[in-house]
Amino acid sequence: MQTLKIAVIGGGSSYTPELIEGIILRHQQIPVTELALVDVEAGREKVAIIAALTQRMLKRHGLEQVKVSVHFGLDEAIRGAQFVLTQLRVGQLAARAADERLGLKYHLLGQETTGVGGFAKALRTIPVILQVARKVEALAPDAFILNFTNPAGIVTEAVSRYSSAKIIGLCNVPINMQHMIAGMLDAKEEEVRLSFAGLNHMVWVHKVMQGREEVTSKVIDMLCNGQSLSMNNIQSLPWPAEFLRALKAIPCPYHRYFWLTPAMLAEEIEAAKTKGTRAEQVMKVEQELFDIYARPELDEKPEQLSFRGGAYYSEVAVELINAIYNNLGKEMVVNTRNNGAIHGFDDDAVVEINSIIDAQGARPLAFGALPPIMNGLTQQVKAFDRLTIEAAVHGCRDSALLALVSNPLVGNVTDARALLDEVLTINRPWLTQFN
């Protein structure tokens, strides 16, 4: 009997039931025989709850034959896997909350994928993700790592540069934008094609096609007239119409952190005072979710998961697995090596771009050069990415300092030096490479 094993690193995540739902709905195309859920000892209770819920969900759909295994080490989970999904959080949500509070202490944004928050999370995550990659090299060399771990672009590039494991990075921002823009146009999803190019959480829609008609300017006009592209976890501040028309492209929700910085910072400061930082809010949501997940009568993904902020996560993951496993040659937006697709970026730079997905992995579609306003910002952030990776891999304080200085949301030496000292102190248990 042919086997199809999927290992989920961070299997105790609150997002996992959405992934399980996606696998169940696509079981005809993706005949999974084993789901190996991996977590750390601190997540033992959560992963046990997730495993039990997974078994109930499978039983509801007549898939009791799918084996669900739980692991607190990597070897047995990865051995024999065709796909290794990474959705881990080193330091758990408490570390994210500390990152956010640290940023606000310096009157800076500390969001978990941008600024000092993204920096600290990358330092904690890269050594661990490289351990996973080395296990994949040794125990499942033909497997694909599908990475959801934030900051997804940096983490994916670290694995791509420092291991031989096959990796593709994923994010739910492009698919959310696809759904929202199709909705704005009152069109079916399959009728609308978006051309993306940029970096993870710094990607633009450069062209919108509805059938054979280009409707980019129409969508921009709709955004200028009150429509909005927003996500649960990002304040939906409106873009000035003059700016959008000058840009001639559609920014992703995360661009607000870079181009509407004062307003976004003010909102986060106020939120931290009243309802808590985003991580502190998520902790409350997660506690409620796991209370629901633990109910023995629950055998489907609960509606409350939509409040967590990971909408369409499973859709992206399952579509990617399907495209690789069945050699579909399907176009998707992923994080992969540039290989000349975006001019001016190194071939080994990981970019977020439309790609053809088949059994060989991801092949980015040629794009060309980004317009100057986008290229300048993106090159600066890519420099930050590279320096952060070097700092995380080698425990290099010099690279870490330069990374923070190069980040547009820090951008000055005085704050960077002070922030670095605090990041290294607060995160000492996870940053042994700097000791």
Language model segments and positions:
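N-terminal Rossmann-like dinucleotide-binding module
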Residues: 5-31, 35-38
